[in-house]
Amino acid sequence: MIDAVIDIGSKTIRLSVYKVIGDEVKNLFNEKSSASLASFIEKGMMNEHGIQKLINTLKEFKNLISNFEDISKTYAIATASIRNSCNRREIIERVRTEVGIDIELISGEEEAKLSFLGSGIDSQSGILTDIGGGSSEIVVFEQGKVVKTSSLNIGSLVAFDNFARGLFITKDEKKLLEDDIKLMIASNNLNRVQHDLVCAVGGSARACLKLYNEYYDKEAGNVIITMDGLKNLINTLINMENRAKMKLILKVKADRIHTLIPGMIILYRIAKYFYADIIRVSMTGIREGFVYNKILERG
């Protein structure tokens, strides 16, 4: 059985194709588009430009999917980008009519649980975070099971839109962003229990890891970020001359030139809240979790 999963995020729309054999999932194909849908939100609604960007991207993905002869099912899931839009019903109907794809809205709690399920984390207890473009999910798990989830209305793209006046966030803007993140975490009544390790999933975390490995000359397969190293890297980037900063980020992750640093700040503040020493980045997440969940539903 082969399934296609389209993940409609606030910054990136991703297509992944998986081959499912029993309870094993093999990734066959990946494609992405940096649609930045959160940038098209005006007065709580996605404007026509954003809706058209979404529709055009989904048409392109549908065309790619048609190249696979044995696709059993195509799923499209949407997180904060559409979930938080007042005109989400209109968006879903437009996509159904113009593209022929049904979008399934994923709540913040569902998003957190699916990210945990797909992370492949082997620790029995700890914290998992998924930093998206429009929201950040936090999962507290014990004995291998989710015991609490929390969704923060801040992601890398929203942070950039709300706090940065230029291409890069400044020292003063960083302080305002950090204060906002701390207030959001505190308002979610998360117990501040120490966890030495935080697991991170999602595009922001992977981009952060890639920059971290480049800056500290780590091996390509490294998935560990130390808190001291991340703090130093963030401060170095904040104080770095813009041209040098641009050159470094363009080399590593060009499509995240404006959102990478805000995403790193969010990741750091969440991990620091739980007194973590290290962050381990998983290469899998919500899409894999969604497929695993479908396997469980099928029995």
Regions found by a protein language model. Give the residues of each.
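Helical "lid/coupling" subdomains associated with nucleotide-phosphate turnover
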Residues: 17, 40-63, 67-71, 79-125, ...
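A structural signal for short, well-ordered beta-strand segments
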Residues: 31-35
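Beta-strand initiation motifs
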Residues: 23-28, 145-147
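N-terminal basic/disordered segments at the start of proteins
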Residues: 1-25
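Short glycine-aspartate micro-motif
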Residues: 3-7, 126-130, 198
